């Protein structure tokens, strides 16, 4: 039995479907006891969402589950693991990316510079980590952020992505180049050299990319940096660029292309292969993903 007391919070029921889907993908067994939307359980952990919106998490694995999944992905707050988190109101640049885990579509890195008088305006708009927002809301907020703040977006479409990847041979190095390029452009626009980045690799990777561009930056890298308002705004712009790019590719080939790299992605990829051929398939995907081998039937060969 867990020595920790149950973790209890209130969840917006609009997030119930996402939570349920995520838990199923994580291997939880689902039941529907009375007065609940569902109860999900696996070894060492139970997560129950009641029809009132009350969410109860208990079990010996609850701390890891809450800190690394529930807070960043669902609650978008860090009271359990970071109870003293405060909003940084110092003018600074925030950087985030979208598309690195998606087989189809572009890789997008965005940066947003926020001045002191803009924080309250962004808060009032409801700016927060894009992972908690619908595509419709992301597009609405992206337009408002662009009207309010200085920003820069590096959008690398699949064909260019594959070409650049051949040079870097490593996704983290490619991402670091994209981050450094975005930072460089926003420094030129704003004159601000204080930057917060959602950390995706060893800190040295981004520092080296900045050094190559001869950039002197007051850089903070941290995991789950989307709790910072500038990074959250950047995550929205990066996501908007990604979903727009994916939608455009879907229109071009007349096949809906899913996000991620799931079985649905493989199914869509095989349809593209049948309709358009291997060359066209390669032009709209990230070729180093193992998903491509699965689509082409090369797994285990």
UniProtKB/Swiss-Prot annotation:
Gene3D superfamilies per UniProt: Ribonuclease H-like superfamily/Ribonuclease H, TATA-Binding Protein
BP terms from Gene Ontology: DNA replication, removal of RNA primer; mismatch repair
Subcellular location: Cytoplasm
GO cellular component: cytoplasm; ribonuclease H2 complex
Enzyme class: hydrolase
Enzyme Commission numbers on file: 3.1.26.4
Protein role: Endonuclease that specifically degrades the RNA of RNA-DNA hybrids.
Name of the molecule in the record: Ribonuclease HIII
Lineage per the UniProt record: Bacteria, Pseudomonadati, Chlamydiota, Chlamydiia, Parachlamydiales
Gene that this sequence comes from: rnhC
């Amino acid at each position: 039995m867990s020595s920790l007391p149950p973790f209890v919070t209130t969840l917006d029921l609009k997030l119930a479907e996402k939570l349920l889907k995520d838990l199923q993908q994580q291997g939880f067994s689902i039941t529907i006891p009375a007065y609940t939307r569902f109860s999900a359980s696996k070894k060492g952990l139970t997560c129950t969402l009641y029809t009132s919106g009350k969410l109860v998490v208990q079990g010996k694995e609850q701390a890891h589950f809450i800190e690394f999944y529930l807070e960043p992905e669902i609650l978008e707050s860090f009271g359990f693991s970071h109870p003293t988190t405060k909003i940084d109101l110092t003018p600074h640049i925030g950087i985030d990316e979208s598309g690195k885990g998606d087989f189809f579509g572009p890789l997008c890195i965005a940066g947003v510079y926020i001045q002191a008088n803009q924080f309250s305006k962004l808060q009032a708009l409801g700016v927060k980590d894009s992972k908690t927002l619908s595509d419709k809301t992301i597009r609405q907020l992206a337009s408002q952020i662009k009207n309010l703040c200085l920003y820069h977006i590096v959008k690398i479409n699949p064909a260019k992505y594959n070409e650049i990847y051949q040079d870097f041979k490593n996704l983290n190095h490619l991402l670091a180049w994209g981050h450094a390029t975005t930072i460089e452009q926003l420094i030129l626009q704003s004159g601000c050299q204080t930057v917060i980045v959602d950390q995706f690799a060893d800190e040295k990777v981004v520092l080296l990319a900045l050094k190559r561009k001869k950039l002197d930056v007051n850089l903070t890298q941290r995991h789950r940096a989307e709790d910072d308002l500038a990074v959250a705004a950047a995550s929205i712009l990066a996501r908007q660029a990604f979903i727009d790019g994916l939608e455009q590719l879907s229109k071009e080939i007349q096949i809906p292309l899913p996000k991620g790299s799931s079985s649905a992605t493989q199914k869509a990829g095989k349809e593209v292969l049948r309709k358009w051929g291997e060359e066209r398939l390669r032009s709209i995907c990230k070729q180093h993903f193992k998903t491509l081998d699965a689509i082409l039937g090369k797994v285990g060969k």
